[in-house]
């Protein structure tokens, strides 16, 4: 049986080349990058999700997550504009993943991503490519 952990991660995001890159600022003293397909973003807040062990690379404290969201897996919309592609990370949001695998061990039963306004991001862009 796998151990169950609840991970809180602080992230920032940048839109580039049709992809939304989410950089995790803090996760157990490591750095991680999540890459989402922009075209699959919608208006939901809860993201059912699973990843095979081979989907994660660990090297020198760097965790790299690469996965594709299905149409019914989506980011929350901003409350001000109602558009998930218009500066989706300006407001705080909570994204929950049921199961996430690290290496060949299921490290987290529920992976909780607490999205905050930029903490130490180099640059955060909205869908128009403008700095916020």
UniProtKB/Swiss-Prot annotation:
Protein name: Putative uncharacterized protein YOR200W
Lineage: Eukaryota, Fungi, Dikarya, Ascomycota, Saccharomycotina
Other comment: Partially overlaps MRM1 and YOR199W.
